[in-house]
Design a protein with these regions (language model features):
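Proline-centered turn/helix-capping motifs that create local helix->coil transitions or kinks
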Residues: 1-4, 38-44, 59, 74, ...
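Catalytic helix-loop patch of NAD(P)-dependent Rossmann-fold dehydrogenases
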Residues: 1-54, 61
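Residue-level signature of the cytosolic catalytic core of signaling kinases
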Residues: 15, 23, 58-62, 127, ...
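Hydrophobic alpha-helix immediately C-terminal to the catalytic Tyr-X-X-X-Lys motif of short-chain
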Residues: 26, 30-34, 69, 134, ...
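Heptad-repeat alpha-helical coiled-coil signaling segments
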Residues: 53, 57-59, 85-89
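C-terminal substrate-binding subdomain of Rossmann-fold SDR/epimerase-dehydratase oxidoreductases
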Residues: 73-181
């Protein structure tokens, strides 16, 4: 990542030093290889879309920030933050979904198809905050005045995730007119 512009755009070289980031790169490589192998002579648009860290309805998985916060708020468990200082591009689930629909509409209406294209749908720069800052925001705005137990675990081992993750969505904003609200 460029230290002068610490936001990943669609043209950044793919690759990562952690399994999660590498899995995201693999999706891009596999999609591009399918397009080139099976669809290069056809007028079919194949794109990939990347979103920030999506939060909101429908997220029932284990170790997820919003469901875990709500469980802690209801007294069902302590809130465990693995990496409280890590910065993520948080966005509400419907924001990138709107972008995906705008992208699908554009790709459907185009007369010529680009061989392969990636798109970012990311929050505003001010929404790139640390995990602990996100929780503090929840605490400030919560309806119930329950005191929740926050148990912070800082792992002193080899880093498995990127400390600061930011996406540049200028392409989506400029070409699609999309914006995170």
């Amino acid at each position: 990542i460029n230290k002068n512009n610490p936001y990943y755009n669609e043209n950044h070289p793919l690759g990562a030093s952690d399994p999660y980031g590498t899995s995201k790169s693999c999706v891009e490589f596999i999609t591009e290889s399918y397009k080139k192998s099976f669809f290069k002579d056809r007028n079919i648009s194949i794109v990939t879309a990347r979103a920030g860290n999506v939060i909101g309805g429908g997220d029932y998985s284990e170790d997820r920030i919003v469901p875990d916060y709500l469980k802690a708020l209801n007294g069902k468990k302590n809130l465990v933050l693995r990496n409280p200082e890590y910065v993520r591009p948080w966005q509400y689930v419907l924001e990138p979904l709107y972008g995906y629909l705008a992208l699908a509409k554009r790709e459907t209406l185009k007369k010529t198809r680009k061989l392969f294209s990636a798109w970012n749908f990311a929050p505003n720069q001010s929404d790139n905050v640390s995990v602990i800052k996100l929780i503090q925001c929840f605490q400030t705005n919560k309806i119930k005045k329950n005191k929740i137990n926050i148990k912070i675990i800082i792992k002193k081992q080899i880093e498995k995730e990127t400390k600061i993750l930011r996406l540049n969505a200028n392409k989506s904003k400029k070409i699609l007119g999309w914006k995170n609200k």
